[in-house]
């Protein structure tokens, strides 16, 4: 099985990255802060004003290491990568399937909604006794209604737009009770629904930051198996949007991101002071809080779970690659359907 390599995250403004032999070296104010062998690196993600030497860029391209440039708040700016490992026959099959995407869309939605529902079920099982009666009832109602949506989608022969509508309904139910899964006494983490571009409260800021990291991993997974990350099935084409990466992210984010965010908040590893509010209302993680989240994200990706289709254990960080591989096998005709990743 593919080995889970390290992602190097650089969050400190003014850091310089260079190549020394077969190593990536990070320096700040002339002092070496880190050294990692290139053969242990899968990708490099840098935030804000970081200098990356041309020599390191060339070495990363030669080793198949992608460099992702984000601005200081985590918005995507650019990617630096070597030749894309594309297979023209696979991509033709992908483009053809995108014209009639219903079967793949159905599988993606079944995976996403099942995993969202599993997150609610786990929260009710672990903490239901602490929920006020009205909150517990609301979560149970969402669980029941999501089960109905799963049955409806599973039996549906409708077009992709109708399937997307069911996915949107499930998302509304899920995020409608997500705030009740937050057990921190800190009122600043109160969650009243998703807000994006920009996030307007600490919980949304944390979710958006983690979703950015997962999107990067899913995009890299698509490219590593030869798929075009820009052409999706659940997400429609839009210039500049990695639609297929977003497709793969949907079924994974309830488990990889949402549960991690809840853990960081409920265990009080993050406090209200770990966030800053900008003019205009946007809320962002502080630099130190970002390091806390990145460390937890790396540890989360090392945790192993049994893959329901492959029937073997794999680190969570490899699941995007495994799902991209399953999709490629389906598009080639080796699998009758795309098998979603279900969390149990």
Curated annotation (Swiss-Prot):
GO molecular function per UniProt: DNA binding; DNA endonuclease activity; metal ion binding
Keyword tags: Antiviral defense, DNA-binding, Endonuclease, Hydrolase, Magnesium, Manganese, Metal-binding, Nuclease
CDD domains from the UniProt entry: Cas1_I-C
Gene Ontology annotations of biological process type: defense response to virus; maintenance of CRISPR repeat elements
One Pfam family here: Cas_Cas1
Functional note: CRISPR (clustered regularly interspaced short palindromic repeat), is an adaptive immune system that provides protection against mobile genetic elements (viruses, transposable elements and conjugative plasmids). CRISPR clusters contain spacers, sequences complementary to antecedent mobile elements, and target invading nucleic acids. CRISPR clusters are transcribed and processed into CRISPR RNA (crRNA). Acts as a dsDNA endonuclease. Involved in the integration of spacer DNA into the CRISPR cassette.
Descriptive protein name: CRISPR-associated endonuclease Cas1 2
Lineage, uppermost ranks: Bacteria, Pseudomonadati, Pseudomonadota, Alphaproteobacteria, Rhodospirillales
């Amino acid at each position: 099985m593919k080995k889970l390599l390290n992602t190097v995250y650089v969050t400190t403004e003014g850091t310089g990255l260079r190549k020394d032999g077969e190593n990536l070296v990070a320096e700040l104010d002339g002092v070496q802060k880190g050294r990692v062998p290139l053969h242990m690196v899968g990708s490099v993600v840098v935030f804000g004003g970081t200098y990356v030497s041309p020599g390191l860029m060339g070495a990363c391209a030669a080793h198949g290491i992608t460099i992702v440039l984000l601005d200081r708040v985590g918005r995507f700016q650019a990617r630096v990568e070597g030749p894309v490992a594309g297979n023209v026959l696979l991509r033709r099959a992908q483009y053809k399937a995108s014209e009639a995407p219903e079967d793949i869309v159905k599988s993606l939605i079944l995976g996403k909604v099942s995993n969202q529902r599993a997150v609610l079920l786990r929260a009710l099982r672990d903490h239901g006794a602490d929920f006020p009666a009205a909150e517990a009832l609301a979560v149970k109602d969402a669980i029941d209604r999501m089960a109905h949506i799963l049955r409806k989608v599973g039996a549906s022969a409708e077009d992709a737009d109708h399937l997307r509508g069911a996915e949107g309904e499930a998302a509304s139910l899920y995020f409608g009770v997500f705030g009740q899964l937050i057990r921190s006494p800190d009122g600043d983490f109160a969650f009243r629904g998703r807000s994006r571009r920009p996030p307007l409260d600490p919980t949304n800021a944390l979710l958006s930051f983690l979703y950015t990291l997962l999107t990067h991993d899913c995009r890299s997974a698509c490219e590593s198996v030869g798929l075009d990350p820009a052409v999706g099935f659940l997400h429609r084409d839009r210039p500049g949007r990695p639609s297929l990466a977003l497709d793969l992210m949907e079924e994974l984010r309830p488990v990889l991101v949402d549960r991690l965010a809840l853990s960081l908040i409920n265990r009080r590893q993050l406090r209200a002071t770990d966030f800053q509010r900008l003019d205009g209302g946007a809320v962002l993680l502080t630099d130190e809080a970002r390091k806390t989240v990145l460390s937890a994200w790396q540890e989360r990706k090392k945790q192993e779970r049994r893959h329901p289709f492959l029937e073997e254990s794999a680190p969570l960080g490899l699941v995007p690659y495994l799902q991209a591989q399953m999709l490629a096998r389906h598009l080639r005709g080796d699998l009758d359907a795309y098998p979603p990743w279900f969390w149990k």
